[in-house]
């Protein structure tokens, strides 16, 4: 799947954010790996110029987690955070650890799996199974 064809990814690209200053988190990495064909929104962790650009487009509000701030764009289709979830690495570490897929930075699936297992929300259960199955296949392919 060409990520640029996905409407939310197209909106993200349209912002012109500095690619070294953000990473796609949440369920976005599942989209990038072809594990999901759709997502309700894209969660972005941003710093520096990317965060500054986001705050020029809309006023930051408290994040639902109560940890940090977020900017909602495109009717909530893009949620840009100044940090990720409590107990996770800061923006610098998340961005440094990104894997690049089709020119965009995504959080590695192993990290996404950890977060989703910790949160263990109803909506995460299917994603946990999809990621685990994918990672198990990767291990088998490399043996």
Task: Describe each model-derived feature in a short phrase.
Residues 1-143:
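Compositionally biased terminal segments of proteins
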């Amino acid at each position: 799947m060409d990520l640029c064809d996905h409407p939310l990814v197209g909106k993200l690209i349209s912002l012109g954010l500095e690619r070294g200053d953000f990473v796609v988190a949440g369920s976005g990495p599942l989209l990038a790996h072809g594990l999901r064909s759709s997502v309700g929104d894209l969660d972005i962790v941003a710093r520096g110029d990317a965060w500054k650009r986001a705050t020029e487009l809309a006023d930051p509000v408290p994040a639902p987690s109560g940890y940090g701030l977020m900017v909602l764009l495109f009717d909530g289709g893009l949620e840009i955070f100044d940090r990720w979830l409590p107990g996770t690495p800061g923006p610098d570490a998340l961005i440094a650890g990104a894997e690049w897929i089709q020119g965009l930075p995504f959080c590695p699936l192993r990290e996404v799996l950890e977060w989703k297992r910790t949160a263990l929300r109803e909506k995460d259960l299917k994603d946990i199974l999809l990621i685990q199955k994918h990672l198990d296949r990767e291990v088998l392919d490399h043996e």
